[in-house]
């Protein structure tokens, strides 16, 4: 990530406390092993984000609505599954979406996540009631994770 991207993606997440950072300790040393950030987007901000995520979000966008999008997820392979499960416990009442990070290779995709207190039926209803209004929506493939 270029240094100027920090202002678009890292600093707003820190400013609004919309991130989770996981640590691992061996008794002597503590090291970060996983990070996730999210934005709470309005339908309009979501549409702009899905149409061109590379443009980033404005500060106002980060807390503009109730559509939760994972903007950054970083976890080494050995920690990714455990971290995803921990997030479902840490954020148990929420439904999240994320753009697939290899969209250029496999096509644009949206992944869906839910907290552990959200049933699959509740999650489907949540997402159905908040459809993605992006212009290139027809090019997206949905994957429930």
Task: Cite the ranges covered by each PLM segment.
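Short acidic/polar alpha-helix capping motifs at helix-coil junctions
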Residues: 121-124, 137
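Acyl-donor binding region in acyl/amide transferases
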Residues: 44-122
């Amino acid at each position: 990530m270029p240094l100027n991207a920090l202002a678009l993606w890292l600093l707003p997440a820190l400013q609004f406390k919309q991130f989770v950072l996981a640590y691992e300790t061996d008794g002597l040393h503590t090291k970060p092993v996983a990070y996730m950030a999210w934005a709470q987007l309005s339908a309009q901000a979501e549409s702009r984000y899905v149409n061109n995520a590379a443009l980033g979000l404005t500060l106002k966008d980060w807390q503009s609505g109730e559509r939760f999008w994972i903007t950054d997820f970083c976890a080494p392979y050995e920690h990714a599954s455990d971290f995803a499960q921990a997030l479902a416990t840490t954020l148990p009442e929420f439904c999240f979406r994320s753009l697939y990070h290899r969209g250029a290779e496999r096509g644009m995709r949206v992944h869906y996540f839910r907290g552990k207190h959200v049933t699959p039926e509740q999650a489907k209803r949540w997402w159905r009631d908040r459809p993605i209004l992006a212009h290139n929506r027809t090019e997206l493939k949905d994957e429930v994770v």
